[in-house]
Amino acid sequence: MTDLTTLTIAQARYALTKREFKATELTEAYLKAIELANPTLNTYVAITAEQAMKMATESDSRLARGQGGILEGIPLGIKDLFATQGVHTQACSYILDGFKPPYESTVTANLWRDGAIMLGKLNMDEFAMGSSNETSYYGPVINPWRKKGSNEKLVPGGSSGGSAAAVAAQLCAGATATDTGGSIRQPAAFTGTVGIKPTYGRCSRWGVIAFASSLDQAGPIGRNVRDCAILLKSMASFDEKDSTSVNLPVPDYENYIGQSIKGMEIGVPKEYYLEGMASEIVELWQKGINCLKEAGAKIIDISLPHTKYALPAYYIVAPAEASSNLARYDGVRFGLRVPGKDAIEMYENTRSAGFGDEVKRRILIGTYVLSSGYYDAYYLQAQKVRTLVKRDFDQCFASGIDAILTPATPTPAFGIADEKIKNDTVAMYLNDIFTVPVNMAGLPGISVPSGLSSTGLPLGLQLIGKPFAEEVIFQIAHIIEQAIGTFSTEKWWTQQ
């Protein structure tokens, strides 16, 4: 019998409706795969086996009655940033030690409504702050990919490293993730998976632990473009509990997969050609351009002049919002509490013990740029830059451009505890150079696998769309996927 964990969501969904196997069998197959792989890859921080089997049994009952939802019986991994009622939810931080929320996030509630099954909670950078999944309280996630002829452990990207690695290693059919500055698209590119950051406001943020509220957005990571389209249809919704949720109909994204892109205008921004960029990234970009040309799209050279200021502005805006959001973690009502002689000392002791180094760094930066005397010089200026970045995109799309094609990352995955990057915070932050402008402008962006590096590691291209036009970038991404193919890695962890 076929290994059920190799099936895409679309394939598994079809087979389940035809009763070729049961949801309980599919779920068991994933739980066995997790049991075998997790000690090595560290993708899950909580495995909800009992709950998963209960949900699968209920799915089988609905399927037998012909009443299944669009994700009926599909086992998913959930990033540890999403509140799951009565289940471990810690944002992979010690400060939320033991926290089990009494409520469910809107995104996960939508998935359960449509019949999906929860396998467990996925590892991530602490409070989603990181680009390598090395800041987690539970230790780093190991990328399932390896360089040719090497046993070096590589990062899966971040902050949704657990989500991307679990999908790439076939430890879930798909996964939820979040993206504040590239945290879906960068790990997807590093692991040969597909990840989409929807338009800001497309998915509800209610029940998603906040990092930077004006930038955070939930989205899926899947094995291919179609799977991501299926997942986003379920995850997206209007939600009165989220004041930034936008009340627009959610298209059936899957219907756009396979449609022609003939006549579409694809912009290629000159500012994304970075000085000293690896030649294989430039070649990959050209390969993507050629694919789209052959499919009948028009390639237009464009300029996004303020893009170069997006990253420094982001690292002012995001920490500022984080320092405000994370002030609520004080040990009083939930999570870790470290005693002190009075309330102030208790707050200090709790935060000192509970937050990791990267989170502390960003809180310090954020508090500094919001402080008296520096607010106008830093935070206000960064918000003005943000407006200019968004205006560049608006003008580009107003001129008739349908989507923009760029690389997803400046490099393939790097080593765990890479000394050069570990000791250079700016080098780590530069991993998000191609993805951050999309968050600053609130636009949708998708990362699609587009080839392998000279060392055999996945590389990705990014498509940026108009606001609430996710269906267009799904359509174009599928053309690239069809031309270049999908990529998977050997399961070396099963032979250890």
Curated annotation (Swiss-Prot):
Q: Which residues form the active site?
A: K79 (charge relay system), S159 (charge relay system), S183 (acyl-ester intermediate)
Task: Give the coiled coil ranges.
Answer: none
GO terms for cellular component: glutamyl-tRNA(Gln) amidotransferase complex
Q: Which domain of life is it from?
A: Bacteria
Set out the biological process GO terms recorded for this chain's protein. Answer: translation
Q: Which reaction does it catalyse?
A: L-glutamyl-tRNA(Gln) + L-glutamine + ATP + H2O = L-glutaminyl-tRNA(Gln) + L-glutamate + ADP + phosphate + H(+)
Enumerate the GO terms in the molecular function aspect: ATP binding; glutaminyl-tRNA synthase (glutamine-hydrolyzing) activity
Which EC number(s) are documented for this chain?
A: 6.3.5.7
Q: Which UniProt keywords apply?
A: ATP-binding, Ligase, Nucleotide-binding, Protein biosynthesis
* Enzyme class per UniProt: ligase
Q: Give the matching PANTHER family.
A: GLUTAMYL-TRNA(GLN) AMIDOTRANSFERASE SUBUNIT A (PTHR11895:SF151), TRANSAMIDASE (PTHR11895)
Q: Which NCBIfam families match?
A: gatA
Q: What does this protein do?
A: Allows the formation of correctly charged Gln-tRNA(Gln) through the transamidation of misacylated Glu-tRNA(Gln) in organisms which lack glutaminyl-tRNA synthetase. The reaction takes place in the presence of glutamine and ATP through an activated gamma-phospho-Glu-tRNA(Gln).
Oligomer and partners: Heterotrimer of A, B and C subunits.
Q: Which family does it belong to?
A: Belongs to the amidase family. GatA subfamily.
Q: What is this protein called?
A: Glutamyl-tRNA(Gln) amidotransferase subunit A
The organism encoding this protein is: Bartonella quintana (strain Toulouse) (Rochalimaea quintana)
The organism's lineage? Bacteria, Pseudomonadati, Pseudomonadota, Alphaproteobacteria, Hyphomicrobiales
